[in-house]
Amino acid sequence: MAIASQYNAKKVEDKWYDYWMKNNYFHSEVDDREPYTIVIPPPNVTGVLHMGHMLNNTIQDVLVRRARLKGLNACWVPGTDHASIATEAKVVAKLKAEGIDKNDLTREEFLQHAWEWTHKHGGIILQQLKHLGASCDWERTKFTMDDDMSASVIKVFVDLYEKGLVYRGYRMVNWDPQAKTTLSDEEVNYEERNGKLYHLKYKIDGTEDYLTIATTRPETILGDTAICINPNDERFTHLKGKKAIVPICNRTIPIIEDEYVDMEFGTGCLKVTPAHDENDKNLGDKHDLDVIDIFNDDATLNNYGLHYEGKDRFVVRAEIVEELELYGFLDKVEDHINKVGTSERTGAVIEPKLSDQWFLKMKEMAQPAIKAVLGDDINLVPEKFLNTYRHWMENVRDWNISRQLWWGHQIPAYFYGKGKNDFVVAETLNQAVLKAREVTGNAELQASDLTQDKDALDTWFSSWLWPMSVFNGILEPENKEIEYYYPTNDLVTAPEILFFWVARMIMAGYEYRGERPFKNVYLTGIVRDKQRRKMSKSLGNSPDPLGLIEQYGADGVRVGMLLSSPAGNDLMFDEDLCKQGSGFTNKIWNAFRLVKGWEISEKIEQPETAKMAINWYTARFQKTIREIEDHYSKYRISDALMSTYKLIWDDYCSWFLEMVKPGYGEPMDAKTYKAIIAILEENLKILHPFMPFVTEEIWQEITERTPEEALIIAKWPVEKEFDETIIKEFSHAAEVIAGVRKIRKDKNISFKNEIDFSVLNNENTSKTFDGVISKMGNISNLEYVTGSVDGALSFRVRSNEYFIPIAGAIDVEAEKEKIQEELNYTEGFLKSVDKKLSNERFVNNAPEKVVAIEKAKKADAEAKIEALKASLKSLS
C-alpha cells in the first residue's frame, strides 16, 4: 500500500486513538509489575479545555507513555471535580434565565436541576483531552460526587470530628456576597487599590467637643460599638472613661483603652466594629462589646442600616459620606492605598463576617506534611517553591470547611434541638438517630426530629482525598488497589494550588495512610501570551485549544507547548511553536517516505560509508538516550524533548539519511536498509511520549503488526556503552563537509561536478569518515598533502587545512579580488580590536567577560587573515 504523500493528522489521530481504546492499552489492573501511578488534577466538571489544561495534561501523558514503554504498569486516573461554587453559580444563572429563583426551590428540587446540568455539560473536558492524545484509564474515571467518593468524604469528616480536629465555631470568616458563601483564607486574593481615608468626627457625650477617627469604610460606622485609644497616648488622656456618639445613628458607645491601637496611624483613635473586622472582633471579645452586623448576605444593608436598608454597601459608602458632610461630621478626605481582598471564584470584594462555621484544626496535621517536603520524602520541582510551601505550612490557620451552598457534600451534622451545640455528627441519618437518642436520653426520638446542617463542605475537602479515594482507600483501606497503586508517583499541577490542594493531600495522606500520597510534585508555569499577560477569556488572548489541534495536529501542539515549558517557569505561548511542532511532524513523515521509497537489493555488499554512518548514529543515539534519561530524572521535560528533537532533525534526517542514501537511481544493500529500519524504530520509541500519533502511524506502516506489537507498549531502548571517539570524529568530519558545501555554494560549483580534495592534516585527524566526506562532498579524489596546494581554494577546520583546486571551475581574478576585499576588511577589524586591547584603562576596568570576548575576536580575526592570505597565495 502506497504511503500518503502528505501527513493527515486528523485521520491518523482518530484511527490510532480508537485503536488504543479498542485494545485497552490505557487500562491498568493490579499485577506483578512495578506500578506507575498518576492521578489527574480533576478539572471542574462543567469546565472546558484551556491552554493550562493542555500543558498540564501533555506533561502527564508524556510521563505515562514513557512509563508504559519502560514496562511499568502505568495507571493514569482521570476524573472531574464537582466545583461547588462555580457549578452552583451556573445552575442559579440558568434557573434565573428560566424565571426560577433558587430560594423558591427546596434543596432536593435545586439538586435535581444541578444534577441535570452536570449530566448535560459535565465531562466535556475529558472528551476534549482525548483529542490531545491523553492515555488515561477511562474505565477508572471518577467524579467527586460519585457515591463512593461522597461516602469517603463523609467518613473522613466524622472521623476528624471524633478526633477533635473538626469543630464548629462562631468566627470571623471571609464572606463572598456574590456567591453568598464563606471562603477559606487561601481563596481570597489581595490587591492594592487606590481608595480614600475618611476622617470622621464623633461627638464626645455630654460635651460640645469632638474626636476624630480615620476609616476607609465609612458605611460601617452604623455597626460601631466602641472607640478605642492607646492608654499611652497623652493626646487622649481627657477621653478616658468617656463615651462618644456615633454620627447618623446617634448610638452612644464607650471609649475604651488598648495598646493594640497604633498611635501613628490616622488620628490615633480607632472605631471598633466587631461584626466587620477581625481585629475589631478580638477587641470586642476582650472588652465585652456588643456586636452589630449591618449587612445582609448579599452585602446590602439590613435594618441596622436605618434609611440605607436594602442598598448595596458601595452605594451606601458614597451616600453616607455626603450625609456626613452635610451634617458637619466629615473632617477631611485623603487619598489612600488600601489592600482589598477579593474572591478567587467571583472577583467580589470580600466582606469579613461573623458566622457559625465548621473548621478543621490544621497545626497538628501540618507537621508531618512539613517534614515530608523539607526532608525530601516528597520532592517539589522546581525547588524554588520550597520556601513558599514552608511559609504557608508554618503559618497555617484552621481551615473553614463549610460553605453556604447546596451543591456539594452536605455536612453530616444533625441538630436535635435549638441550641448551637444541640447536634450529633454521623455518617448516616440512622446512625445520627442512635447517637441523638444516647445524648438526649430520649429513646423515642425519630429521624423526623433531626435537621441536617444545610451547609455543604468546601470542594477542596473532597479533592484533598483524591489520591486515596479514587482507589477506594478510605472506605476499604486494605483493598488490593490502594495497596498496589498508592502512593502514586508523580503529581503534575499548578503552583497556585500548592496549598489549596497539594499540601492538603499530603496532610490527608499522612493522616489516613501514614505515608506520602506521591513522590514528586511537578509544578507547571502559567501559560501567558507573547506580551507576558496571563491568558484569559476577558482579554481574548487565549486561543481555542481544539482549534490549534485542528490546524496543527495534536502532535504539533504537544511539541509546541513543551518546547518552551520549563518546570515552574511561565510559558510564553506563541502559535509559531505549534507551527514548528507541525513542521517537525512533517519532517519525520517525509524522512520515513524517503526511506520507504528506496529500492533494496540482496546482492549488493554493504558500503564502508554506510557501516561508519550506522556505527556513528548508534553511538550518537546512545549518548542522547543518556541525556534524555538525565532530563527525565530531573523533570526537565522540555529539555528531554529538545534532545530528542535535535537527534532526529539534525543527526537522523540531516546527516544519517544523507550518509546512507544510495546514489540516484541506484538500489540500497539489504543490510544497511535493515539497520536503518531498526534505527528508525528506536527513534520512534523515544519520540512516542511526545508525539504519540505520528510515531504509531509510522511504526505500523513499517511492517504489519499484531496488537501485542503496537508502539504504545513496545520496549524503551536499553542503555548501552557507546564509542565517544566516533562521535568526535564525525563532528570533525561534519565541519569538513559543511566547509566543502559552503565553497560549492559560494563559488557556484554544482554538486553534480566532482571535485578533487586535499587535506593538510596538522591535527593527525582520523581517516574514519574520509569515505563519508567524499560521498557527501562528491569528491573524486581525496589526498593528504604536506603543504599548501597552489591554485586552490582553502578553508580550515581547527588546525587542519583543506584545499579544493579550482582550475577551470571559477574566474580566478574575480575570486582573488573578492578575497582581497575580505582581507582588507578583516585587517581593519583587527586594528580596531587591537586598539581597544592596547588601552590599559579598558583592559583594567572592563569586566573580565568583556575583555575575554575582545581577545577571542582578535584570535578569530588573526586566524581568518592567515587563511585568506593562504587562499590568495594559492591562487597566485
From Swiss-Prot:
It is an enzyme of class 6 (ligase). GO terms for molecular function: aminoacyl-tRNA deacylase activity; ATP binding; valine-tRNA ligase activity. A motif ('KMSKS' region) lies at residues 534-538. GO terms for biological process: valyl-tRNA aminoacylation. Its EC number is 6.1.1.9. Pfam families: Anticodon_1 (PF08264), tRNA-synt_1 (PF00133), Val_tRNA-synt_C (PF10458). It comes from the Bacteria. A motif ('HIGH' region) lies at residues 43-53. InterPro entries: aa-tRNA-synth_I_CS, aa-tRNA-synth_Ia, Anticodon_Ia_Val, M/V/L/I-tRNA-synth_anticd-bd, Rossmann-like_a/b/a_fold, tRNA-bd_arm, tRNAsynth_Ia_anticodon-bd, Val-tRNA_synth_C_sf. It catalyses: tRNA(Val) + L-valine + ATP = L-valyl-tRNA(Val) + AMP + diphosphate. Keywords: Aminoacyl-tRNA synthetase, ATP-binding, Coiled coil, Cytoplasm, Ligase, Nucleotide-binding, Protein biosynthesis. HAMAP family: Val_tRNA_synth_type1 (MF_02004). ValRS has two distinct active sites: one for aminoacylation and one for editing. The misactivated threonine is translocated from the active site to the editing site. PANTHER family: VALINE--TRNA LIGASE, VALYL-TRNA SYNTHETASES. Belongs to the class-I aminoacyl-tRNA synthetase family. ValS type 1 subfamily. Monomer. This is Valine--tRNA ligase. The lineage of its organism: Bacteria, Pseudomonadati, Bacteroidota, Flavobacteriia, Flavobacteriales.
